[in-house]
């Protein structure tokens, strides 16, 4: 088989050169379109299921949330195993699939299973899927630099403006907010006043719930004009909450302000984010989607941040605290320079030691063609250009050249033997 292949190649030299040129051209195209990252993604093929049930202990979360979900999700096909973690008010479940499984197929199967499993959960509890990213998907961290702005205001800017804008960037799976606190209206009841007015906690909660609502009406016509009726009932400030009636006592309404104190405050936090010991900060983590080019996504996010910065309040600006693009450029450029140096040194050594320019060229020309062809294979298997893959190519240069040297020396040896036989036959004929 090999002998026939070599014979066919020798008889069709132009075709061999044409195939080599085409292969090199496709290789250059593959190099330009290959994804770039600092490190390979070796994380597990997982789908995260997050469930929140505020105020419940870890044991209750384990018994009523985690256990039903884990037992239900174990029946999904192509699942290796299911891990879970229960904590105060939250449950995390990690469904680990086999490596060859498409991540979006896996997410659809988990979502399909959750539609039936959630019937076994307490009322009002709804599990959600985590972002469609990997364990190394955190590509950029940023904080908001302000001139003494309240942490609640910073978090509001992050949650209601910056986050939504950056999530629209192509390749971004999620922008996770951190730091500060989320503003909320807090109603602090006085037990003595509740007892005095004979009002229960549930009465206070129901009063707020029933009065914080809007409803639509029907359309009616008047003087040949159509009007749409709606009621406006959403609470807008502290005074409106304080004036809500709970019940009547001897024809006198008992209001929220009679039994409780209403204030604007931050939600209770389990931790804070401190930036280099300078104090608390508010920011976000940009998570990259499965299979995206990290370098391109970071560039797009930075471009979007420049647009978003124009709409920020005066004195507020972005401060990038972690940017993987610097690591990507330094690591990949370092390997590329090493690769070029190896190619030049190997080519020079081959030319010096072979002392035969035709043989040297036939060996040297294999290096760029083989490297270009290797990127075609990298793209075919969806492997990015990173430290490990480029280092492997650099180490393989010696093998590429060694193979060419052996073939050239063997060919030269066989030609010399054949030439000696021809010379011997020529002398005998004379």
Segments the model singles out, each with a brief description of its role:
Residues 27-32, 37, 317, 344-412:
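Hydrophobic transmembrane alpha-helices and their membrane-interface caps
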Residues 299, 307, 311, 328-337, ...:
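Cytosolic juxtamembrane regions of multi-pass inner-membrane proteins
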Residues 1-343, 352, 358, 423-424:
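Membrane-proximal extracytoplasmic
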Residues 12, 109, 113, 304, ...:
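Short alpha-helical scaffold segments that flank and stabilize functional sites
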């Amino acid at each position: 088989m090999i002998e026939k292949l070599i014979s066919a190649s020798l008889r069709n030299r132009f075709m061999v050169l044409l195939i080599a040129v085409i292969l090199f051209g496709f290789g250059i195209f593959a190099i330009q379109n290959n994804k770039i990252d600092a490190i390979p993604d070796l994380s597990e093929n997982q789908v995260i299921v997050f469930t929140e049930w505020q105020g419940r202990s870890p044991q209750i979360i384990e018994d009523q949330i985690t256990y039903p979900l884990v037992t239900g999700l174990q029946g999904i096909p192509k699942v290796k195993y299911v891990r879970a973690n229960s904590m105060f008010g939250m449950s995390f479940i990690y469904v680990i699939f086999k490596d060859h499984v498409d991540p979006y197929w896996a997410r659809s199967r988990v979502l399909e299973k959750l539609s039936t499993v959630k019937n076994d959960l307490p009322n009002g509890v709804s599990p959600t899927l985590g972002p469609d990213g990997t364990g190394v998907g955190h590509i950029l961290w940023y904080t908001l630099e302000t001139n003494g702005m309240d942490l609640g205001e910073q978090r509001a800017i992050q949650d209601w403006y910056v986050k939504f804008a950056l999530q629209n960037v192509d390749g971004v799976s999620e922008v996770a907010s951190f730091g500060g606190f989320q503003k909320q209206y807090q109603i602090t009841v006085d037990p003595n006043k509740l007892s005095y007015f004979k009002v229960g906690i549930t009465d206070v909660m129901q009063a707020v719930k029933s009065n914080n609502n809007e409803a639509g009406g029907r359309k009616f016509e008047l003087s040949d004009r159509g009007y749409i009726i709606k009621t406006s009932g959403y609470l807008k400030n502290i005074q409106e909450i304080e004036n809500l009636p709970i019940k009547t006592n001897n024809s006198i309404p008992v209001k929220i302000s009679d039994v409780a104190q209403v204030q604007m405050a931050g939600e209770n936090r389990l931790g804070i984010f401190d930036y280099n010991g300078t104090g608390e900060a508010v920011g976000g983590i940009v998570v990259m989607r499965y299979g995206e080019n990290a370098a391109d996504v970071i560039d797009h996010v930075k471009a979007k941040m420049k647009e978003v910065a124009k709409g920020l309040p005066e004195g507020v600006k972005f401060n990038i605290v972690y940017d993987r693009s610097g690591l990507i450029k330094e690591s990949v450029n370092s390997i590329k320079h090493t690769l070029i140096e190896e190619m030049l040194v190997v080519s020079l050594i081959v030319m010096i030691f072979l002392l035969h320019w035709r043989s040297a060229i036939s060996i040297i020309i294999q290096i760029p063609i083989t490297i270009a062809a290797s990127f075609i294979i990298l793209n075919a298997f969806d492997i990015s250009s990173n430290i490990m893959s480029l280092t492997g190519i650099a180490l393989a240069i010696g093998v590429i050249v060694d193979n060419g040297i052996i073939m050239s020396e063997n060919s030269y040896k066989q030609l010399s033997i054949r030439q000696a036989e021809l010379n011997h036959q020529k002398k005998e004929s004379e």
